[in-house]
Every structure is written in structure tokens, then in C-alpha cells.
Amino acid sequence: MMTTWSGGKLSSQKLKELAVCALLAVSAQSAAAPADQFTKLLSTLDELRSSQPSACGETLRKEWVGSVARDWYLWNDELAPVDPADYSTAQAYLNALTEPLAADGRDPGFSYLTTRQLDESQYTSGAYIGFGFRSGVGPEDALFLADVFESGPAWEAGLRRGMRVLEVDTGAGFETWQSLAERGATSSEVFGPAVLGTQRGFRLLDHDDEVLEVYIKKDELDPPAIASEPMLIDRPGRDPVGYLNFRQFTLSARLPLINASRFFREEGVTDYIIDLRYNGGGLLSIADVMLDLLGGNLADRQRSFFLSHNNWRADYNVYEYFERFTESIEPLRFVFITTRGTASASELVINSLAPHVEVVLVGSDTRGKAVGQYAFDQPGCDARLRLVSFEILNGEEVGGYYTGLADTGRFTLCAAADDLSRPFTDPEEDSFGTALSWLEEGSCPSQPISVEPPRSWRRSSALPAWLLHPPKALGAIGYRRH
């Protein structure tokens, strides 16, 4: 995809470098023009980093955070007039600075402090230490496996999405999930620390209503960006539907996306179900690639999206353009399966495709993250500031989806539940079945069900706090990764 600055064009290498700085994620997780504008941006970022205090204490870290925020924060003219001396940590000071934007939903924790190592590991590959599954809470506060990562320890032990966790052995014998929840057991107690070799026993109810007992150990794993393989869903008398379950916009997702698009193109698929229900976003460069693959043939060289900075940094506003790849598909209709865990880069892709092709949402409304962050590193320290620095609009300069894409009134949403008890592509799974129905009938079911968010992100006195309010770094809202 080509990137222009004030009508100019950047090389693919420069775009790749910019992508390292730009992040689009909900987090605990964007004919050739002169490159001098881009070089100016990189130089400015380098100067800003090198000119800040190098000491790593909280006092100077707060000064550094304030300096960067006043210069680069998207709404820098709305920062709260607070005294850094009133706050014990730089994160607390940052929260206070951005409180006016948190209150109205524009920045509810999207700006945060982390470390360079944690940040880079999260958004280059998504690697972490764990069992290799994501859990979610369903009806009656039951705990289900929402997703199991291929080739991870849980997958190798036979665990699959839809299995219900009945009991956990934390080292002192099995205890029921209900008992663990009622006594407020912590996440670390139930699933153990993020340490290689940590073992837990699980008793689960499988898809045949039989009890499966397994003991598994944590390992370092890198969840595949695409769940299983791209699939063709047969339809009697019609061309098949292409199904893709896309987990995360990490650097490791580029080749799988290209391969999936090539597969669909060779099969002549025109109707698609793109499952983004747990995709909280990621890197701008991967959103770039996905848009080219999905929309490059429809809108080659037309504007795809626009990054808008604050008035002080307006020189760095940038348009992106669709570009046709040899693997780009020829779509007629897209159904995107979404939840409140669908955010940021996922929303960018949907919003940018909408002016060019028929798009419908199935599930529940999206998160509403219409902004992206740059990464700022404190010199000589391990601190990295992820700061909301630009707003994301589509090629027609339409955005503003701070309460979700459907809430803008510009998208059709067919209400459906995320049925944690069934596999993703089970025709009886409500979201998948509704998506197929829309492609068949061209309309939402006549009597849509009442959709509620997963219990794990609603209030419930029966659940421990860590399930009610999962840290943003763990991915999709309401679904814990273990």
C-alpha cells in the first residue's frame, strides 16, 4: 500500500519503518512522494526521545511523560492541568492527564506505560508463556474454552473451543470451578504464574458430554495469527463461502494473510465471513496488507484511510491508498463477526472497506477504538510510552466510531451471541449461523435475539475481579489468555 504525505509517496521500506512506530490495538494491545517528510517524522521522534531526561526515577519519568504528551497527544489541548508532584508514579500521572478523554470514551486507557521488551514481544509475534488457550464465561457463570491455539500444550492435549472447565487441580487436588469462583481465587492461583513448566490439571466436559482429564504444562508459544486454516463453506447450488478467523495483527500475520488470500482467489470465492470476534488489533502495517488483499482489486489507488494528528503535528497527517496485489481477492460481500473485543486495526479494516463493498456486522458492536498510538522510549531506561497520537478515518475521512462501528448508524448489525459452547464454524453457533443466514437471505434474521456481552465483562458478584476486569494487554475484552 502506498503512503502519501501532502500528496507525495513513500517507499515501501519507509512505510515499513513507520509501521514499527504506529500501533493500533486494545492493549493491558498504520507514483511516489518525497521521503523527506517521513524522514522528518523519524528525526523528530528520535530528537524527542534523546532530548528527554535520561534518569529512570519516577520524578523525571513523569516530566518525560508530560513533555511527550503535550507535544504528541492527539488531544493535547484537552489534557488536564494536573501537578505531577501529586502522583506517585508516571502511570498515575498519565492517567490524570488523560482523564478528560477517558471520561467521554475517547481514551479509556489506550495511552499507557510499558517496557520495550514487553511491547515488542506482544506486537511482533504475540508470543507468551502459557497453556495455549483463551477462556470466557458463559451462561450461569460457567467457564468455557473460547479459543485453543494450534500446536500449543492445550491443543496437543486435546483441548478445543467449546469445552467447559469443570474442575482445576492447582496442586492440592481438584476443586470445582464454581468453588474457585465463589471464594475469589486469583488468576495466578487458578492458572499459575507465567513460568515455563507450570502445571495444572483440568477436568472438562467435551463436545460428546464426556469428562476429559488432562495435566498440561506451560510453554513458550506463539499463537498462529489465523485459527486453523482458511476454509470453504459449501452452499447447495451456490459458490462456497470463504471463512477466515483472524486473531491478531502482528508481524507474523503477514504471510498467513497473503497465503489465505491466494487460496480464496484461486477458488474464485466472492462471499466472505471474516471472524474478528477476539481480534483486539495490532500493527498498522498488517492492517495495510489486509486492506490491500481484501480491497486492492476493488479500489486500486483509491484512498483507504487517513491518519490525523494534533494541530502541532498536522504536517505528519498521512493518507493511505489501496494497492492491488497478485493475491488480492475479488469480493462481492463481507460479513464480519464482531464483539466488544473487536477493536482498533480490526475496526480500521471494516471502516475502510465499507465505501467500496457491501459490509455487514454479525454479533455485537465493536469496541470503538478510533485512534492509534506511537511508541516513545525513555532514553537510558526500559520505559516505553504508548501514546494516542492520531485519529483513524477511512478514505472518505469518516471515522469517529468511539462507541462502536454499529453505533454510528453507518453499518448493519445482525445481533448474535458468541456461543462459547460450540466450535467457531458449527452451523448452530449463533454468530456463524447468523452470518451464513445473512449471506443466504440478504437480511438479518427476522427475530434477532437479545445479545448481552460475555459475563466476564459484566458485573457479577459470583465471579472474581480478575475475570470481570481482565487487563487490556491480554487481548480481546472479556476473554482471558492462559
Locations of regions flagged by a protein language model:
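Bacterial N-terminal signal peptides that target proteins for export
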Residues: T3-A19
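Alpha-helical structural motif
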Residues: K16-L18, R61, P427-F432
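Flexible, low-complexity junctional segments that flank or bridge functional domains
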Residues: A32-D271, I286, V451-H482
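P-loop NTPase catalytic core of nucleic-acid-dependent motor ATPases
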Residues: I274
